[in-house]
């Protein structure tokens, strides 16, 4: 019986001495976590998709004939060919306002055409429009224009356009629809010239002011070949809000076109656009157009509180430093002292080089370098001690029995 007890106790102690090989002292929490990961994190959606595929394949196998499927394929192909193709829509463009834009001209409040710049709106080839669109060779304001002439507020006279009623030969009208060959303002365009809210002259239309031969001016004077807005115009182009360039410029100068709220080669609004003007009001800016970068868009701003101060966690406790200094003051040198603890987080310190020759009693916190120390092998120490005790007990039992 004694031998049996000795054998049992010895086997238990030996098993505990080698926990990793014999399966004792296993961390069951890890096993539980692994089981949870295995069974809880299953993607149920994949099962649903598999069931759908299986049911589809079963239905095709039971109720359908693959030959019939092949016979239906040419029919479907013919149906696809017969179906009219849906025209592509440019989702970036804004809907036209207060009228329509004509081919060869500029749309209102949004659209831009190559070769000219519109003011606060669209641009058409060859000239600049006011507060809206520009027409080829001239600009129309606040309305509609017809080819060769436009009517204001609805009516148009053949061979000329009237503003708020009357039409002039070779000019464009306002407040209406747009015709081929020119662009209207706020909706319409006129071929050969445009007039705005004022009088129209033969060969051109004037906007709120005077008009020059060959073009229409808005809110000021107009020059031949283009329309100007709210400013002066130079020969061969119309200027808006100030300066004008050859071919017509709005709110800036552009060679061969009018620019709005800025300068552009070919016309630009609220920036620069080559070959056309962008409407700053409608926001329909397209590349290559110069836009203004919004605040915070160009670069990433490091927000307040993003940087974390990790040094605060490593600052030792002043009280702990003082107590430890009192204990090791006489033996403290320029080398790091032992950590204050044998397990967990503690503090260690050493003298600064400048305080190497100071007497121990003269040392203070300013003469020391301190840092937090961490002892991570606490469990290993306890395991060594416990295993040593077990080995001693085993030897005692073996020797005295």
From Swiss-Prot:
Region: Region I, residue numbers: 91-95
Membrane topology listed for this record: Lipid-anchor; GPI-anchor
Lipidation (GPI-anchor amidated cysteine): 378
Positions of glycan attachment: 342
Species assigned in the record: Plasmodium cynomolgi (strain Gombak)
Tree of life domain: Eukaryota
Biological role: Essential sporozoite protein. In the mosquito vector, required for sporozoite development in the oocyst, migration through the vector hemolymph and entry into the vector salivary glands. In the vertebrate host, required for sporozoite migration through the host dermis and infection of host hepatocytes. Binds to highly sulfated heparan sulfate proteoglycans (HSPGs) on the surface of host hepatocytes.
Record key words, sorted: Cell membrane, Cytoplasm, Disulfide bond, Glycoprotein, GPI-anchor, Lipoprotein, Malaria, Membrane, Repeat, Signal, Sporozoite
Homology family: Belongs to the plasmodium circumsporozoite protein family.
Region annotation (17 X 11 AA tandem repeats of [DG]-G-A-A-A-A-G-G-G-G-N) ranges: 98-278
UniProt protein name: Circumsporozoite protein
Per-repeat ranges for Sequence: 98-108, 109-119, 120-130, 131-141, 142-152, 153-163, 164-174, 175-185, 186-196, 197-207, 208-218, 219-229, 230-240, 241-250, 251-260, 261-269, 270-278
Gene: CSP
Cysteines joined through disulfide linkages: 339-373, 343-378
Biased composition (Basic and acidic residues): 65-99
This protein's record includes keyword Lipoprotein: yes
């Amino acid at each position: 019986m004694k031998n049996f007890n000795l054998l049992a106790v010895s086997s238990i102690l030996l098993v505990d001495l080698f926990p990793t090989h014999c399966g004792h002292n296993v961390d069951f929490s890890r096993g539980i976590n692994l089981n949870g990961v295995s069974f809880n994190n299953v993607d149920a959606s994949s099962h649903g998709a598999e069931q759908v595929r299986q049911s589809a394949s079963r239905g095709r196998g039971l109720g359908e004939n693959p030959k019939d499927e092949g016979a239906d394929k040419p029919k479907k192909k013919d149906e696809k060919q017969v179906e009219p193709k849906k025209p592509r829509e440019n989702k970036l463009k804004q809907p036209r306002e207060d009228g329509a834009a004509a081919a060869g001209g500029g749309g209102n409040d949004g659209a831009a055409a190559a070769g000219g710049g519109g003011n606060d709106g669209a641009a058409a080839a060859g000239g600049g429009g006011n507060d809206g669109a520009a027409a080829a060779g001239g600009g129309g304001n606040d309305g509609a224009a017809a080819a060769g002439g436009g009517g204001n507020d609805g009516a148009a006279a053949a061979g000329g356009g009237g503003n708020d009623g009357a039409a002039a030969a070779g000019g464009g009208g306002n407040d209406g629809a747009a015709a081929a060959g020119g662009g209207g303002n706020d909706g319409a365009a006129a071929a050969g010239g445009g007039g705005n809210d004022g009088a129209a002259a033969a060969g051109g239309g004037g906007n709120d002011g005077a008009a020059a031969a060959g073009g229409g001016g808005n809110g000021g004077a107009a020059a031949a070949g283009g329309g100007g807005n709210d400013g002066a115009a130079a020969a061969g182009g119309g200027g808006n809000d100030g300066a004008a360039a050859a071919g017509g410029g709005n709110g800036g100068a552009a060679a061969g076109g009018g620019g709005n709220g800025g300068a552009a080669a070919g016309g630009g609004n609220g920036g620069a656009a080559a070959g056309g003007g962008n409407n700053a009001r409608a926001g329909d800016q397209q590349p290559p157009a110069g836009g203004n970068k919004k605040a915070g868009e160009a670069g990433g701003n490091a927000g307040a509180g993003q940087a974390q101060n990790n040094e605060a966690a490593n600052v030792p406790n002043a009280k702990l430093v003082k107590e430890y200094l009192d204990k090791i003051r006489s033996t403290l040198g320029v080398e790091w002292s032992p950590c204050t603890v044998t397990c967990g987080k503690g503090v260690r310190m050493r003298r600064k080089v400048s305080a190497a020759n100071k007497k121990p009693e003269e040392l203070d916190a300013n003469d020391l370098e301190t840092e937090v120390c961490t002892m991570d092998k606490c469990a290993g120490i306890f395991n060594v001690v416990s295993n040593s005790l077990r080995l001693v007990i085993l030897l005692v039992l073996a020797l005295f029995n």
